[in-house]
A protein has these predicted regions:
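LysM (lysin motif) carbohydrate-binding repeats in extracellular/periplasmic proteins that recognize
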Residues: 1-13, 51-54, 146, 154-157
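Extracellular LysM carbohydrate-binding repeats and other cell-envelope/extracellular binding modules
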Residues: 4-33
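Gly/Pro-biased beta-strand-loop elements
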Residues: 28-126, 153, 157
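Short glycine/proline-enriched turns and hinge-like loops at secondary-structure junctions
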Residues: 67-68, 134-136
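Immediate flanking context of iron-sulfur cluster ligation sites
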Residues: 126-135
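Short beta-strand-centered segments at strand-helix junctions
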Residues: 137-152
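Well-ordered alpha/beta subsegment
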Residues: 158, 162-165
Length: 165
């Protein structure tokens, strides 16, 4: 899927030159748009000219707690943040009261939180990278911690986040 996204016109025939991901790029240039592709269960980052900068496998919302269907805007990123569970806003846990989980290995939002304009929704890391690629979040978009950090470092407030099917 990644190779097809990088080479939409390729036939993948013997001897054909194609683009491949350079996973050792280090820092991303500034991201101008984020696309959450629900059908590919992935996050794509683009520069201002529309060039694909990064492709990250992701976890998205489940059927009962879906990921949004509309465009949102990034409001900023918070590394190593607290996670606050509010049963009035998120009815997916067993707790019946407000809980705060400090930063660390068991924090549900992992190493970084990219805040979005819809209350309680964001793009974030995870303490369980083996679950990436599943449809099991509470509506947010999960990435591995290393991917979430890389993306957060390149995203400024005001970047559009578009959800596509």
């Amino acid at each position: 899927e990644l190779l097809r996204a990088l080479n939409p016109d390729a036939k993948f025939a013997a001897g054909e030159t194609i683009r491949v991901a350079d996973v050792g790029v280090g820092e991303l240039p500034d991201v101008a748009k984020i696309e959450v592709d629900k059908s590919e269960v992935a996050v794509k980052a683009f520069d201002a000219s529309g060039k694909l900068l990064a492709f990250y496998p992701a976890t998205i919302g489940s059927d009962t707690l879906p990921t949004p269907n509309r465009a949102l805007i990034s409001e900023g990123a918070a590394p190593n943040t607290n996670y606050t569970y509010d049963p009035k806003k998120l009815n997916s846990g067993k707790a019946d009261r407000l809980l705060t989980i400090q930063p660390g290995p068991n924090n549900p939002v992992g190493a970084v939180w990219i805040d979005l304009t819809k209350d309680t929704y964001g793009i974030h890391g995870t303490p369980a990278p083996h679950l990436i690629g599943k449809r099991s979040s509470s509506g947010c978009v999960r990435l591995t911690n290393w991917d979430a950090r890389e993306l957060a470092d390149a995203v400024k407030p005001g970047v559009p986040v578009v959800f596509v099917s």
